[in-house]
UniProtKB/Swiss-Prot annotation:
Entries under PANTHER family matching the protein: 39S RIBOSOMAL PROTEIN L12 (PTHR45987), LARGE RIBOSOMAL SUBUNIT PROTEIN BL12M (PTHR45987:SF4)
A GO biological-process term: translation
Short name of one Pfam family: Ribosomal_L12_N
Record gene name: rplL
Keyword Ribosomal protein among record annotations: yes
Protein's name in the database: Large ribosomal subunit protein bL12
GO molecular function list: mRNA binding; structural constituent of ribosome
């Protein structure tokens, strides 16, 4: 497979498929795709600006509530996990369901999970 063929295959993937690809590459090669954060040289002002400009949010499942099955279904729809993985995630609450997503996506996930009966927090 040439580099051009690989690029074409990657361009055709969904965001979830790309996320799974990154996780598989991290696991296979024992590396992390996390970006190294350099210490701010401007002091506290740079850190304060970063807090104000938060663009990525985590959706945390705090409590399942009485409708565990509905919450598992909602988690499966949001993450495209299999039944067992979604069930394990729900039973491990509090647990991050979605990480580093936009405000809009975080709000949509929160609404879907709350509609299923879960208690959700966005961080």
């Amino acid at each position: 497979m040439t580099i051009d063929e690989m690029m074409s295959a990657i361009k055709g993937m969904t965001v979830i498929e790309l996320s799974e690809l990154v996780k598989a590459l991290e696991k296979e090669f024992g590396v992390s795709a996390a970006v190294a954060v350099a210490a701010p040289t401007a002091g506290g002002a740079a850190a304060a600006a970063a807090v104000e400009e938060k663009t990525e949010f985590n959706v945390i499942l705090k409590d399942v509530g009485a409708n565990k099955i509905n919450v598992i279904k909602a988690v499966r729809e949001l993450t495209s996990l299999g039944l067992k993985e979604a069930k394990d995630m729900v039973e491990a609450a509090p647990k991050a369901v979605k990480e580093n997503v936009s405000k809009e996506e975080a709000d949509a996930a929160k609404k879907a999970l709350e509609a299923a009966g879960a208690t959700v927090e966005i961080k």
